[in-house]
Amino acid sequence: MLLLLHLLPAVLPASALGSCTGAGADRQLVLAKVRARVLEHLSPPAMQEPQKDVRRVHRRDVLEEVEVPPEEQEDTSQVILFPSTDVPCEPTQPDKLLEEEGIFTYLFQPSAHALSRTLTSAQLWFYSGPSAAPNHSAPAVLTLSPQGRVPVVATASRTPEHWTVFDFGPDALPQLAQPLFVLLVRCPGCPCLADGDKMPFLVATTRAKAAGRARRSAVPWSPAALSLLQRPSEDVAAHTNCRRASLNISFEELGWDNWIVHPSSFVFHYCHGNCAEGHGLSHRLGVQLCCAALPGTMRSLRVRTTSDGGYSFKYETVPNILAQDCTCV
């Protein structure tokens, strides 16, 4: 036990020991630590011209979303899903029936990450062309069921760029949370385009499943050591000034809003405060206590980045950056 107390500063990660520099950390110091922590794991793109031959997602429109409360931002992510099948623009049968015209079929296969979370909202973006024929019905979304094709509850709206956006209702979300599902768009008079810029796509917003707190990673030492860390110090005053602080940070403030596009901001949790010198065991051993994150309780931050000005996106993770529990160790 005594040896463990000596070794704790050596085995704790540097991010957990950041508060040992003192309790007077101002905003600029915290921002500098966040910048350094992010750059340890992510690399900003070099300035370059956008690649014109890459399928472009309409970044201006897709990234317009409802503001998420700061306390929920770190648990919310957005997924852009393209169909896993090509768009057939020719009839599969020469004697295709007239009522089959204007039916577009798309197969979607969500990722394992998306399936592990709760779907909170979804939109289907479908390019319906510059003008809709007045003698045709409005576009609609259907899905397949044992009874055949059934309508999906969705509200349709058009954008100035000639896209029809289907906002799915809550009753439709369980159908979109399957490992494999088919969506059909009925749009008589709409063009059938296989061009990548006009490919339909699904925008899904998800959050962590509401099963309580996120599961913590295993502590890499014995339960006895963890018990030692969780126990208050012999000097109660050593813990009175150690707490978890929070700071709302925007990526625009960090100068990265053209690189990290979602979330636009996040709540940075960190350990803050001093640990007074006690007169117990730690004082006799000459060990300085630090206000730091309890090992095994740090959480990661998931972000969506672009390296070509919004033509493509990818998800990246900054591990162990958000403190959940703080203590004097």
Curated annotation (Swiss-Prot):
GO cellular component: extracellular space
Residues marked Cleavage (site): R60, D61, R216, S217
Disulfide bonds: C242-C291, C271-C326, C275-C328
Glycosylation, residue list: N135, N248
Protein location: Secreted
Signal sequence interval, chain numbering: 1-16
Alphabetized UniProt keyword annotations: Cleavage on pair of basic residues, Disulfide bond, Glycoprotein, Growth factor, Hormone, Secreted, Signal
Post-translational modification: Proteolytic processing yields a number of bioactive forms, consisting either solely of the mature alpha chain, of the most N-terminal propeptide linked through a disulfide bond to the mature alpha chain, or of the entire proprotein.
UniProt GO molecular function: cytokine activity; growth factor activity; hormone activity
Subunit: Dimeric, linked by one or more disulfide bonds. Inhibin A is a dimer of alpha and beta-A. Inhibin B is a dimer of alpha and beta-B.
Pfam families: TGF_beta (PF00019)
Function: Inhibins and activins inhibit and activate, respectively, the secretion of follitropin by the pituitary gland. Inhibins/activins are involved in regulating a number of diverse functions such as hypothalamic and pituitary hormone secretion, gonadal hormone secretion, germ cell development and maturation, erythroid differentiation, insulin secretion, nerve cell survival, embryonic axial development or bone growth, depending on their subunit composition. Inhibins appear to oppose the functions of activins.
InterPro entries noted in UniProt: Cystine-knot_cytokine, Inhibin_asu, TGF-b_C, TGF-beta-rel, TGFb_CS
Family: Belongs to the TGF-beta family.
Name this polypeptide is given: Inhibin alpha chain
PROSITE patterns per the UniProt record, alphabetical: TGF_BETA_1, TGF_BETA_2
Cleaved propeptide residues: 17-60, 61-216
Principal cellular location given in the protein's record: secreted
